[in-house]
Amino acid sequence: FAERGATLPMTFGHEIAGIVEAVGGDVTTVQCGQQVLVFPWIGCGNCDACHEDRESDCSAMRIIGLKQKGGFASHCLVEHEKFLVDIEGLDAADVVPHSCSGITVFNALEKMGALRKNEWMAIMGCGGLGMNAISIACAMGFENIIAVDIDDAKLDAAREMGAAKAMNSQRRDAVEELQKMADGRLMGVLDTFGGAVTGRIAVRAMSKAGRYLLVGQAGGDFHMPQVWLPQKAMTVRGSHVGNSPQLRKLI
């Protein structure tokens, strides 16, 4: 946490849901007693990104639970009503992960853009981010999803979540197998793990004009010939959490 800017003393906890107990005099869209989900990725409030509700693009974020006191407490102060999302009638325990993992993959999937009926997307990693990505991708209308992991039990769960196909990437021919499963039309890869192996597989398996979206932060380096970027017309892009309107849209 220190590497991300946290200093002690600090109350952690960035996935927060609760009941509004008090509001300021200028608040008009939130009422006391309302059940809400907190958007924790608050920006500086002064830059162009913040003025355009693109808080995750702010270079001086003041994240609740990291740079502001978080949710591991009886009360949490939220500075503006736009950072609260109404979740009345929903199970808070089911909804609260969407303020982190949910909005992260939702933002990346929106950046991915639509795919044609004969095009495929691979979701690398079937942990919390990956499973959320599969579920949300299906809800967004993506149909041709290939789940990729090294754990067969997770791959079985990914199929149940909605993945059309699944592949264990420990196969020595992982790149060729992934291309085959996508019928030569792997146009998108969402990497929720973010390690050297997943990056290497992704950029080699993608078809021309494919899009590689990285949200996982396992760390490491992967290498590819620089000439691939123009010759394969590929997009390699990072994506970091999301913005407050996206969380409201996701919920």
What are the roles of these predicted feature ranges?
Residues E3-P9, C44-M124:
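NAD(P)H dinucleotide-binding glycine-rich loop of Rossmann-like/cofactor-binding domains
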Residues F1-D48, E88-L90:
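Glycine-rich beta-strand-centered segment in the early N-terminal region that forms part
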Residues E176-Q179, D183, G219-I251:
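C-terminal substrate-binding/catalytic core of Rossmann-like NAD(P)-dependent dehydrogenases/reductases
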Residues L37, M187-L190:
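N-terminal Rossmann-like NAD(P) cofactor-binding module of classical short-chain dehydrogenase/reductase
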Residues V36, G89-R172, E176:
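Mid-domain Rossmann-like dinucleotide-binding core that forms the NAD(H)/NADP(H) cofactor-binding site
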Residues M206-S207:
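Helix-to-beta-strand junctions that scaffold the AdoMet/dcAdoMet cofactor pocket
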Residues V215-G216:
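Acidic carboxylate diad motif detector
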Residues E119, G210-R211:
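Glycine-centered, small-residue-biased loops immediately flanking beta-strands
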